[in-house]
Amino acid sequence: MNQLLKVDINYFDESFRSQIAPTALGFLQQLDGLSIFDIKGVDQSRNRVITTLIHGNEPSGFIASHWWLRNDKIPATNIRIIICNPEAAKTKPKFSNRYLAHEKDLNRFFSACDSDMLEIALRARQIKQAVAEVKPEAVIDLHNTSGSSPAFGVILADDERTLDLVSLFTNKLILTGLTVGSIMEQSFNAPFATIECGGSNEISSHQVAKDGLHEFVSREFIFDNHSDRVEIHRHPLRIELVGDASIGFSHDRLPTTDITLRADAEKFNRQCISAGEFIGWCDTGELLLLQAIDEQGVDQINHLIDRNNGCLFAKQTMQLFMVNTILEIATNDCLFYATVEKSSLNEMEKIRIGI
C-alpha cells in the first residue's frame, strides 16, 4: 500500500450531482483526494458543514452524503460536504483501512503546528481551512465506531445549540474534555458535534447517518430547543495499554498477551457494566499494564478496575464506549472510553478528596 495523500483539493458544485455514480463504491472511485462539495441552499446567507471519511473504514457518513447528493434536493442553507480521506477508503480492501499504512491517524493531526510538513498535517490544515472559510453556523463530523455499538454524539461544549445538533442524530452523547488532536477540538466559532453513527458494518448505522443528515440539511432552523432529549455521559476516561503491552480477546486467558479481554467485550457498548463484572485477565506481575487517563491527564485505572488472581473486574458502575476487538486500534489508539455513572462517581470523588 504505497498510495500517497494528494495535495490538490477537488471542488464540486451542483452541476456534478447528476454525474455521481449510483453506488457509494462507484462514487468513491470518482474521488481523487480531498473532495469538497458545495451545494447552494434556499437561504444562501448561511452555511452548514459536514465532514466525513476522516477514517477510511468508517463509511456511514460517506454513504449518507452520497445518498443525499444524488437525490438532488435543495437544502435549507448552503451545504459544504468535505470528504476528508478517500485515499484510505480506496486502499484495498476498500472501506477497511482507518488510514494509509505509512501514515498516522488524520484525526490526531488537527492541532499540529503550521510548521509540521508531514503530508497528513497538511491534509488536516486543508480540511480546517475548508471548514473555517465558509464561516459555518454549525459543523457535523460523521464517524463510525470500530466495534458494534449504538449511535452517540461527542461534544466539548455543554450548550443548548450543540446539544440540538446531536439530537438530530441520536439522544445519547459523551461530554468530554479529553484532547487528542481531533477536528472537534478546533475553534470554528460554531457549534460542533462529532456523531459516532454506530458500527461500520451495520445497516442501522448508515440509516442513522442518512436520517440525521437529512434533518441537518433540510431544516430551516436546527437550533430548536431539543437539547432536553439528550442523555449526557460526562467526563470520559480513555483506557489504553501501557508502553509496549500486548492485548488479545478470547473466551480464555491467552498465554501470548499481557492483557486478555473477554471475547464478547463489545456487548458493553450497549449496556452499563456493573461493579464486580468480570472483564478479562491480566499478567500477575506487580503492575497492571493499563491506564485510564482523565481530562486532567491523571491515571484513574486503580479506581476503575480491580485485579484478583490474574482476573480483571469492574470496580465502578460504568458505561463503556467504542469497545472493539480490532487489535491494531486497541494497541495503537485505545481499548475503549468509559464514563463512571452517578452512584459510583460520588464514591470516586470521596476517594479523590480523601473523605
How would you label these PLM feature ranges?
Residues 1-355:
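Structured catalytic-domain cores with a bias toward divalent-metal coordination
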